[in-house]
Amino acid sequence: MSGVLILSARVGAGHIRAAQAIQKAFAESGATESVQCVDALDYANPLFRRLYTKAYIDMVNTMPALYGFYYDEREKRAKHELLRPAFSRLNTRPLIKLLEEHQPDITVCTHFMPAEIISWLVREKKLATRQAIVVTDFDIHVQWLCPSPAHYFVAIDEARAHLESLGVPPTAITVSGIPIDPVFSQPKESGAMRDKHGLRRDAIVILISAGGFGIGQVDEVLASLLQLRHPAEIVAVCGQNEELKARVDRLAGDVPAASRVTLKAVGYTTAMDEYMAASDFAVGKPGGLTMSEALAYGKVFVVVNPIPGQEERNSDHLLEEGAAIRCNNLPILAYKIDRLLNDLQRLISMRENARRLARPNAAHDVVAKLQLLEAVPG
């Protein structure tokens, strides 16, 4: 390959993280081709960019039921939509110009918006590229489907079957798993990771991606977990949200010194793999990337209040496979975890299920398949 362009969109962190994971896997593979990673929204007009991100966040946070309805309705209509893709093209002319000038040999999309623009350019014979589409959820929504030929990378066999039912040839589908940072494929000993990050060895460790919750919901989640009957350390990762970290730090300071449950706030970190390896459970919103990272180290995922749509469908898959539990009522979150801890055989089985489902090498598998596809004339 001589030129690869990876395109994503910052609508939720998962799409960007998947793109970065693939770019990193290309670098680790020793590939000599040019590999660039761009956020498609950087090549959109400012108003469209703001509307595209803000509308999603606002609807998810304030009207989740409406978002779920919209998500399901789009599934019924997506194959026949004309106005929305045309509106996207109208507002992403700099992206279209980039693609026409760059003419990458392969385009890899981890979000459907740039994928549909590339598909249109290919149909209009303005772009000659091999298109790859990497779905970042366990489920496949029809909005990912493109009219022009493309190779699809999906998380599970069920997604493959869904695509085949929609007319995609089996040879155009690879069940790769969801690409996560290749660092999650490296074995790590839990005790060593606890020592490295100053975590307790005498307690279960619960990892929370606190940034995925609203401020008020974080308070409820932590208040419930502090009622655990088992000795536990709660590690709340707050990312770059300094206000959230300060709030969790204050809550941690209010925990009595003799409490069996302790709380630790972590700001922005590049060691999520190490914190995940150190943990017993991952608690959070069921994004495809976050759940895949938990599976990589065989951790049971505790799903909290999934929004209707992709989060609910993601959680359904792990619940069906016995690798997750779900809590819809935050006051009983501690009860549900305590109940699982009291059933050792069930806990062991769920951890085994998580390891069975894990695809920690997904990013490298995507890259290897892309290199094979490029070697085939066409």
Show which residues each predicted segment covers:
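Conserved N-terminal ligand/cofactor-binding loop architecture of enzyme catalytic domains
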Residues: 21-102
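C-terminal "capping" alpha-helix adjacent to the active site of nucleotide-linked donor transferases
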Residues: 321, 329-346
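Active-site and donor-binding regions of nucleotide-sugar-utilizing enzymes
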Residues: 18, 69-167, 172-175, 181
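A donor-sugar binding/catalytic signature common to diverse glycosyltransferases
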Residues: 275-313
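A short, well-ordered alpha-helix in the C-terminal region of glycosyltransferases
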Residues: 346-360
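A nucleotide-sugar donor-handling region in carbohydrate enzymes
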Residues: 150-212, 240
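Donor-nucleotide binding loops and adjacent catalytic segments primarily
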Residues: 191-192, 199-278, 312
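C-terminal alpha-helical cap of glycosyltransferases
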Residues: 359-378
